[in-house]
């Protein structure tokens, strides 16, 4: 092997080693991204149960210590048990809420109410089972129950006023009319008429009170049965019952004149604090009975408060206040599916990937998230190993093809040697035949013997020529077959090389593109900056570099949510890109910062262009729920001087940007 071949193979080996190191760095970055996703997911899963929160805290500690093998093997069983226990407790609390709300609704249905009030109350009782299983519906159910109870009490109060019934205090302490009444039980029929249906208390509800036992006329007072006494002692304040004469154990309800939902005695297992705390909402204020609920506003406003038309493309999505897992589950599933789609898995790992995709797609709950992430980490690690194996397989196939080429070259050389041998043999045969013919002519004594000798020699010449042609045809056919096979191998290698080059180019474009805005990223900026600096050193001319930063972008994320921030970045990136020239270059440097390269542009022309870009961003009609929202940006611009490196010029433009920030933002500084 020559020295050039040795150097060429050495260069190929070094290039492949460098490529392998780049792949290793890429996989390290993906593993770090997966670890960060685990930490964010554990934070999103907190807040529902103390035991689960402790496991999530331990999970983050394990990820920080990078002790995933031993740490996760001990944590996962405890986490699964804590998740199952938490789910059981949540279901028990939900069932207690359903039972308690149902009992309250049944107590109201037991009253003598008009049909127009009983109908929504029955509908409410039928909907409790389904709606109360969602914690966000609990405050709404309590508000509806409060409104229905207020209407029922108002209806009963109106009926009592029409019947001329005495007030509650008059019945408790007696009045002028009761002193002159001869019959002590005269007030009993009015109470019975107001509530003529005995109410049987539910098993989980507190016992209803019993009224004072009226003294029967014509006889001494009789002692109350033990069960009635127990009911009186356990009766809560605010309830007055009247027992019909002769039936001391039958309980009748006389409700107070003014009572709110939170003053009712709640059945066992239901409390406002626990219910609202689980639902994550504050108690809804009571709604007056005569106030109808206003219709909901349209989802997409057409006009803002000033009556101006707004553009739906610039509408920011509403913020999500501390979402639970159910709110962030679609985002987590989409992120995991995108990560899974981005993995170039070999065919041997496709079944595991499809099984993992089925587990993620549409049915992932938060206590299955950790096992899914573990399996995804295994796939990522196996893909890194697979990349190493693919590279080794590629080198092996390359060696085999080189050996095949060497074999074809050896065969071609052997064929060439055979052709030379055949040519020399044919020449020798011709010379022998001609020499024999000459000798026969000289030795012939008569014409007949000469004729026979010449004929014999000519036949020998023809036979030698036929043999030579046959061998030549066989050799040509063999060489043609070898050339055809060699051409097929060369075509196959060309196709493989094109596919490999196309795949590398696709991966390169993905690596140089920001996935959120579609602009070139920092790596693409570094590559383009080197090209522009080299061009300027070679050809001369002007070259400007500008850095733009969105003002108060953190406040946008905090006030309106990260989805709104992402939408702002996409819109601003589109506005900047469509207003730049074809020769200009813009990249997202990171966060809310953008970098612009302006070749062949003077400093004054670049300043005017940056001012137009800032004005275009400020003119974007951003709005949130119909309210206009002003978003501005600050910028710093500078020009290359002499043989400056790109890093020094970028630092100067960055300092100009910070001067604009310190000077009040929404301005351009020239360095």
Swiss-Prot record:
Record-annotated active site: 592
Localisation: Cell inner membrane
Region described as Disordered: 204-223, 278-298
Alphabetic keyword roster: Cell inner membrane, Cell membrane, GTP-binding, Magnesium, Membrane, Metal-binding, Nucleotide-binding, Transferase
Marked site positions, Transition state stabilizer: 554
UniProt-listed Gene3D superfamilies: 3.30.70.270
List of residues binding substrate: 557, 562, 566
Cellular compartments per GO CC: plasma membrane
EC numbers, comma separated: 2.7.7.65
Entry note about domains: The GGEEF domain is required for function.
Summary of the function given for this chain in its UniProt record: Catalyzes the synthesis of cyclic-di-GMP (c-di-GMP) via the condensation of 2 GTP molecules. Cyclic-di-GMP is a second messenger which controls cell surface-associated traits in bacteria. Localizes at the cell poles through interaction with FimV where it increases the local pools of c-di-GMP.
Protein's name in the database: Diguanylate cyclase DgcP
Lineage: Bacteria, Pseudomonadati, Pseudomonadota, Gammaproteobacteria, Pseudomonadales
Gene symbol of the encoding locus: dgcP
